């Protein structure tokens, strides 16, 4: 199998809702419950000190729930949230619809320092609608010790066939070690973003040039079956409920031979204070 792994660019984006009715002295921020967003919350005191009289309220949710609630709120002009973390997929479309305020910064924020791809991806009609907290792509994280023991290596551009072979070689269910961990929890913010990039590498696409759905194509059938088989044979039990945080806990406990997910995970899996296998993760 020579389907090459493709990269999905992503980010945590701070955007301001145009429909939010800010109560005097309060800002409500909706964000995802990953480590870096939790760290961001620790800066609340600095903001409130510099802006006396403004209190920041945080609504922290898992990724799937966050996307559902934010999308519903902003589309219906509910006004629950003033500031929110969204992705590059949503920012330009929502901005063009007038759902987000365009952002204008003072001289202390160097907009020109933003990577062009990030800035362009967050803009519509020449206006910037969100500011990146970080930018990321996806990558393979793997246990060097397990791969070495299996007599294998990880090339710079692995195919899905190689990933499958490596997962099989590293799986040791008797000792609670599974060759690969992938998001299995249903949802755009969970398994579907990953599955879309996997399907692309199999030649699948959501629509053709005339916007006709292509989900019943042989390429989609191949990709979905490959994904299911990979997790069924070499993934941990309960994969259908796993998203980023669940898999992070598994890999840090040494339960996963390999994980394909956001590059933001690197700072956690390589941290000896968080991961039991930090010294053997590549």
What kind of feature is each model-predicted range?
Residues 87-138, 161-164, 178-179, 191:
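Hinge/lid segment of periplasmic solute-binding proteins
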Residues 225-282:
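Extracytoplasmic/periplasmic substrate-binding proteins
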Residues 101-116, 156, 184-187, 202-222, ...:
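Short, solvent-exposed loop/beta-turn-alpha elements that line the ligand-binding surface or hinge
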Residues 166-169, 209-241:
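Glycine-centered hinge/linker elements that transmit conformational signals in sensory
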Residues 61-69, 89, 158-165, 238-252:
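Short helix-initiation/N-cap motifs at beta->coil->alpha
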Residues 10-18:
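Bacterial N-terminal signal peptides
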Residues 129-133, 138, 162-212, 256:
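Extracytoplasmic/periplasmic solute-binding protein
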């Amino acid at each position: 199998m020579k389907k090459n792994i493709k990269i999905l660019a992503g980010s945590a984006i701070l955007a301001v809702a145009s429909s939010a009715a800010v109560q005097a002295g309060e800002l409500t921020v909706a964000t995802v419950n990953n480590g870096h967003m939790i760290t961001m919350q620790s800066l609340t005191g600095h903001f409130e000190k510099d802006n006396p009289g403004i209190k920041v309220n945080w609504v922290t949710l898992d990724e799937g729930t966050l996307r559902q609630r934010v999308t519903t709120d902003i589309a219906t002009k509910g006004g629950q949230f003033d500031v929110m973390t969204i992705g590059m997929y949503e920012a330009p479309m929502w901005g063009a619809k007038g759902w987000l305020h365009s952002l204008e910064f003072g001289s202390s924020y160097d907009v020109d320092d933003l990577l062009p791809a990030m800035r362009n991806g967050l803009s519509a009609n020449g206006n910037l609608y969100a500011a990146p907290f970080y930018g990321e792509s996806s990558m393979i994280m793997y246990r060097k010790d397990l791969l070495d023991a299996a007599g294998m290596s990880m090339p710079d551009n692995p195919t899905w066939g190689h990933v499958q072979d490596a997962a099989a070689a590293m799986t040791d269910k008797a000792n609670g070690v599974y060759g690969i961990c992938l998001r299995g929890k249903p949802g755009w913010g969970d398994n579907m973003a990953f599955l879309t990039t996997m399907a692309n590498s199999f030649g699948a696409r959501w629509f053709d040039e005339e916007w006709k759905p292509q989900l019943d194509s042989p390429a989609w059938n191949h990709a979905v079956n490959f994904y299911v088989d990979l997790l069924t044979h070499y993934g941990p039990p309960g994969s259908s409920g796993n998203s980023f945080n669940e898999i992070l806990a598994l890999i840090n406990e040494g339960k996963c031979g390999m994980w394909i997910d956001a590059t933001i995970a690197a700072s956690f899996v390589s941290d000896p204070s968080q991961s039991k296998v930090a010294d053997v993760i590549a």
